[in-house]
Amino acid sequence: MKLLGLSLLAVTILLCCNMARPEIKKKNVFSKPGYCPEYRVPCPFVLIPKCRRDKGCKDALKCCFFYCQMRCVDPWESPE
């Protein structure tokens, strides 16, 4: 019983430390200008992503969910 209580205390302390310093998790958030294209396409399944963030795309391309997959696409200038 003491081991369970000690484990819960340790987990609580670790979670509090993580919440007290959120800047560590999102240190270098990088987003390219423009908006992701929005097309309503029904996806029966999601394909393996070709990118994870804008930083992984060449030139002015953005990493967006497009045709059931995260991929590098030309961004829109406005959201409309």
From Swiss-Prot:
Signal peptide: 1-20
Main localization, broad class: secreted
Tissue localization of expression: Constitutively expressed in kidney and epididymis.
Gene Ontology BP, a term: defense response to bacterium
Pfam family, one: WAP
GO cellular component: extracellular region
Domain called WAP: residue spans: 29-76
Location relative to the cell: Secreted
InterPro entries linked: Elafin-like_sf (IPR036645), WAP_dom (IPR008197)
Inducing factors: By intranasal administration of S.pneumoniae.
Alphabetic keyword roster: Antibiotic, Antimicrobial, Disulfide bond, Secreted, Signal
UniProt-recorded Gene Ontology molecular function terms: peptidase inhibitor activity
The keyword tRNA-binding belongs to this UniProt entry's keyword annotation: no
Cystines in this chain: 36-64, 43-68, 51-63, 57-72
Purpose: Antibacterial protein which inhibits the growth of E.coli and S.aureus.
Name of the protein described by the UniProt record: WAP four-disulfide core domain protein 15B
